[in-house]
Amino acid sequence: MSQPVPLFDTYKNFQFLTRHNLDGELPAVLEAFERFSNPTEAMDGYSVVKLFLKSYAANQATFNSYRTHVERLLLWSLLVCRKPILHLRRQDAEAFLEFCLNPPENWVGPVTKSRFVRIGGRRKADSDTFVINPDWRPFNYTVSKATRKLADETDSAMPGIQAYQMSQTTIAQVFTVCGSFYQFCIDEDYTDANPFRAVKQKSRYKQSVVSQVTSRSLTQLQWEFVIEAAEHMAEQEPEFHERTLFILTTLFSMYLRVSDLTGRDNWQPTMGSFKKAGDNWWFHVVGKGNKAAKVSVRDSYLPYLIRYRTTLGLTDLPYPGEQTPLLSSLDGRTGLSGRRIRELIQMVFDAACARMIEEGLQEDCDALRAASLHWLRHTSATLDAPFRDMKDLQADLRHESLSTTQDSYYDSLDDQRASSIKAIPIKGR
């Protein structure tokens, strides 16, 4: 395949797609995968991009913008660079940005009304099929009504792709969105590198205006709904969801990433990963970059640990050197995949959202729909920051730089800074 094709449908139809399988995709999209040189790489890249877009599915305008830019990146990686999207490096990111500034003719066309065309009768029916709109292009130019009318009257061709020019604002959006995509992939443990962060001459692609990063954390109220939903699920179906409650509280209480629960090639978490030193409990992990670390365990987490261990028929608390797997499948197999853990957390989010709707909290539900597992880490750190020393929080988050912790979780210091000057008069002091 050399001609780019649309891979993602409208915002409305995207809402019906599931996160972790391709059951809801249009047949036209599935057929398009088979025409790529490596269909498996195409589907893998598509699946990760879909998860990224799901995290922005609460807002249609944001979704449409992010879909445009990250879909271009996916198509470029497959058709031009011929690399999996998660294997791109700095040079590739720079090449893509230059590509966006000057796309080839077959990637540019006029704005089309639809990405997919319905085939069927005059009225919509379940039997209708959808095919890819052959006029769709990743990059679009607009032609004014006057220009179109003049072309019709003089029987001349309308301006073509030479009319396309990407604005500085748009290329800045490309840079930001693609960088956000790779940060999402890092957070979700799909990759360790963000090629757009490493781009040289960033000023060429970034606006000088500093944009505010959207927070990816739940409010205190939303978190209360989430944990109460998990507790209710555990009470109703303990054989299935005591483990779910344990996973949720473990991720939240210790700011963990999903890989801290699934393990790595050279390390697997066990109950023995909990170790007591004096009066304090610690959870020992091997994190990103194979770095060993320990995370402090709060007292309020221990009842959840005891509760889960009781369902497994274990002693209340772990003993030194215990090799019991931290997590197992319901049929007793050691460990859980990251995909399965995400599915369980999503079940909790869905249950919490349903309860929010019952109580008239539609906006909170809309926000929760955008949440992913990694939001638990951000949520916990955000809620804990006012009560913890910055360096202690940095250590438990395992941030290399203190400034990362400060910039992410101590924005309230700006409020203190602003309020400290509000009441100071210019005269008459």
Map each language-model feature to its residues.
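Short pre-functional
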Residues: 179-183, 242-262, 283, 383
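Conserved tyrosine-mediated DNA breakage-rejoining catalytic core shared by Y-recombinases
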Residues: 263-307, 313
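C-terminal catalytic core of Y-nucleophile DNA break-rejoin enzymes
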Residues: 287-307, 322-348
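Short, basic (Lys/Arg/His-rich) helix/loop patches that form interaction surfaces
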Residues: 342-395, 402-403
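C-terminal secondary-structure termini that scaffold catalytic or DNA-interacting sites
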Residues: 423-429
